[in-house]
Structure formats: C-alpha cells, structure tokens
Amino acid sequence: MRRAFTFAVLAALLLAGGAQSLTALEWGGTFDNTTTPPHYLGFQQEDTLALWLEAEFNPRMSLTVQGSYTYNLDRPYLFDVDILRFQGRFPLGDSSQMELSLGRFRVADFSKLLFDDNLDGAQLVWRSPRANLALNLGYLGLELQPVSTVSMTWGDLNNASIWAPPRLIEMLQVELPELFGRHSLSAALVAQQDLRSEDLQPEGPSAEVIGLGGRLSTEYLGVALRGPLAAALYYDLFGYLGTGRTLSYIDGAYSYEWVLSGLVGGGLRYFRGEWLSSSAELRLLLATGDEDYTDLFIEGNRDGLATVFSTISQPELALLFSPRLGNLMLAEASYSLKPAAVLQTLLKATFFLRPTLGPVSDARVDPASSSPYLGTEVDVAARLRLFSDLGLAFTAGVFLPGGAFRASDQETDFGGRAELSFSF
C-alpha cells in the first residue's frame, strides 16, 4: 500500500514536471480520536484521519500537503485540506535567511490569543541572529466553516455558508531575541477587514433587528517582553491596543462607531528539571469590557465609543467555561510534573471575573447582577506518550459558577475529555 501510494505521488509529480528535481519524499498519517463523556449535549465523539506529504525539490524548495477526513454525529462527512504549503528558503549571507511560503498554513500572533488559525495566502520571513521578521497576508473565506475558529459578528455566527467568514488578514511581527541580557522583545501589527457586502443591517433609523449585524473591521498594535528574572524563574508580559468600527444601535438608529479596547496579560513560571521536570506557573489576563453593551454581547454597543475587546479567532481558555475574550479577567495557577518519562501531569485552577458589570458572551450570566465574580474552574490532565507514535490524554474538570450567574444556572458543572493520537 505504501509503495503504491509513493508511486502514485511520484507519477503525479512527473506529470507536473517536477519529478526531475525531486530530492526527497516523505509521507505519513495520523489518526486522532476525541471523546467527551455525557455532558449538556450527551456523549460526543470525533475521529480524524489525516494524510501528509513532504516533498523536497532541492535544499531550498519544498512542498507540504495534508488532507483530512473528520467524522462525528453532527458532520459525518467532512473532508478538508489542512496544509498546502510551498516554501522557498533563500540564504542571505552566512547568518541570515529569507523564507517565502505560499498556500495554506497555520498562523498565530505571539500571544496565540488574538489569532491562531489557518490562512490562505503568503508569508515572508526574515531570520537573523539579531532580529526575526514575519509578514503574513491572506484570506480566511476559503476555509471550511465547521473547522474555522473565526467568529466576530452576528454574520459570522449565523453564516449559512459552508465557508468561513470572508475576512482579509494582515500581520506583521518583529522579534528581537535577547535584546538585552536574555530578554526578548516582540511587536505585532495586525489588521483584519470584513469583506462581507450583502445581507447586512443598513445604517439609519430602524427598529432593532436581532441577529443580522454589520461589518466589523479591526486593527491591533501589540508588544511583548519575556525573559528570566532569576535562576529557574521566567516571566512574560504582553499587551494589545485594539481599534476599529462596529455596528451600534443608538437612539433608534444604526451607525458605525469607533472601537478602542485593550488586552493585557502576563505570567511567572518556575521550572526545576531535577524535580521531575516540575513547573509552577501563575498567569493573569484582562480584556476590556463595556457596561453599555446589551446582554446579547455580539455587536452590543449602545452608547458611543465601544470598549469591548474582540479577538479574531476564539481561543479555548478552559475545558468547561470558555467565554469570548471580552469583558473578562482571569487568574490562572497551574502545576505540572513528569512522574515518569512517558507521563506528564497537570493541575490547573482558573478564576474568572469581569472588569465591568457589562455582559460577557455566556448567556448564563445575569445582566442585572452586580457581582463581578464569574466562577472558578479546576482541571486535571494526564498525557501519556507510550510510544513515539502513540499518545493518550485525559482531562477532567469542575466549574463552580459565581455570583454573576443566574440563580437557575449556578449548579456545579462537571466534564471530561479523552484523546488518542496515533501516527503512521
């Protein structure tokens, strides 16, 4: 089977005119299973089979392709192209290199909170001992909607198309490694444009229409600093300033109002390799909110300047309670260790609050509540790497809702997840 597949790939490359310069070819696959025990929606299971191919035409040119099939009860047939990346590497002197990538590939900002998803487009990277620069330009609307994590407006949420929201992304990131001592500085400029032109709520006087929404284009400027404070003690700090324009409903009329928002975070990490690779970490995160927003949260501005921070993709903050990163403050304490070479364990507690008494994206929060406390989640996880090509992971969590939740929704929440990964 493996020989037949390799022969078919070589034949395809020959027909394309590229086999004469092919110097290396590798292929393989992965099978991933995610199982969620009975919860709100009952027993859930998802299986993904992926096949990948890496072809090197010469030391400077390569092609990476990965396709996958995912099965679950909601979507029994989901075929996707995860990666389709043509990459060229061009040395610039003895210590620097330029890299150009075209196609579909994963892109993330330095925090992995603002944007972390696939991008169809181009990436230009310059690497040197003193500085690293990455410029990304791409389109999000060619990714399948079920696998996309991009969701910013009512139009994104109510998208009946199989395709992800039509948005254009530009991202420029600069890293200065070991700028002073062993401390590194990073900066990022990110912008996204909403290209949707139809089925939008027009500006002007109107009765309020729920669920239609408008366009949301945003820009972000971010900086980050990380490095050691002492032996085995490390820190990282970052912040984003966000702006843009969002559809707002004010005094019986729709209009686009300016956004001015912020996201700040940081952490301390203490690591001792000789103590079973023990790592203790404390992290803080704050995303601005707006008391003038309605309890629907999405495009909820009702009074002038909008100050809710909006991420482009939606990160997972915890196993059970993971609202949108807007009007949210959290403190996270975690401890991990490796009691065996094949076993990694983790204990994590996350405390959620809201910096303003405005709404958050979870509908269980009472808009009339004066409590800033959203709740506490405790998660435990174990990861087993039994063989180099076989891994298992088990996660369990409990969430205790806080005083900001409706009285009818303050029951303790339990949940778990089991994951299996096999490579071949």
Q: Which residues are covered by each model-predicted region?
A:
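C-terminal structural cap/anchor segments
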Residues: 279-281, 286-373, 377
